[in-house]
Amino acid sequence: MAEISAKMVQELREKTGAGMMDCKKALTEAGGDLAKAEEVLRKKGLSAAAKKTGRAATEGAVASYIHMGGKIGVLVEVNCETDFVARTEGFQGLVKEIAMQIAAASPRWVRREEVPADVVAKELEIAKAQAREQKKPEAILEKIATGKVEKFYSEFCLMEQAWVKDDKKKIQDVLTDAVAKIGENIQIRRFARFVLGEGLEKKQENLAEEVAKAAGLQK
């Protein structure tokens, strides 16, 4: 087991706002891994960010992002607790990052709870059919299908998508970091994504790649 140093405890405490003993216990449970320890605290509701998420967030901003050339447009509503925070550079920057994420990664829903039950059922059905085609044993079909649905969530639910600027983080992590830094509950409420000519027959182009280039993520 990794040795838990005072420096590690202090670092986790500064990042989460949790108590010293809670930080030490979380680090021990996580085997000295800071990221996992932070997750342990969040699950137990002991981090400052976790506590803030229960507070009402009725202020915020509705922001837009138009991709270069006008081929993709995004509207997103992000809520916070006060008008003061809504006007800060940090919050405005976060909202812009989220809008660009939506433009680049094409999510369909904010969180998995919003995915219609019939859509989930259809994905499970397709996953099982594919597994049978691959001659997988019936006993493990459910497990395989569940794994496929989890992947579906990570592709199409905004909060579970990998961040386009750092694929080691999910959007949920980006939001949690922002809550801890800004000091208020922050929630992504809803969004709309528009693609020029969507549904019409046209030449196929990689729009996600173009957005990434516009954001300076590709050369």
UniProtKB/Swiss-Prot annotation:
The keyword Kinase does not apply. Keywords: Cytoplasm, Elongation factor, Protein biosynthesis. It is found in: Cytoplasm. One of its GO terms (molecular function) is translation elongation factor activity. Belongs to the EF-Ts family. GO terms for cellular component: cytoplasm. Associates with the EF-Tu.GDP complex and induces the exchange of GDP to GTP. It remains bound to the aminoacyl-tRNA.EF-Tu.GTP complex up to the GTP hydrolysis stage on the ribosome. Disulfide bonds: none annotated. PROSITE patterns: EF_TS_1 (PS01126), EF_TS_2 (PS01127). InterPro entries: EF-Ts_dimer_sf, Transl_elong_EFTs/EF1B, Transl_elong_EFTs/EF1B_dimer, Transl_elong_Ts_CS, UBA-like_sf. The lineage of its organism: Bacteria, Pseudomonadati, Myxococcota, Myxococcia, Myxococcales. This is Elongation factor Ts. SUPFAM superfamilies: Elongation factor Ts (EF-Ts), dimerisation domain, UBA-like. Residues 82-85 are annotated as: Involved in Mg(2+) ion dislocation from EF-Tu. It comes from Anaeromyxobacter sp. (strain K). It comes from the Bacteria. Pfam families: EF_TS.
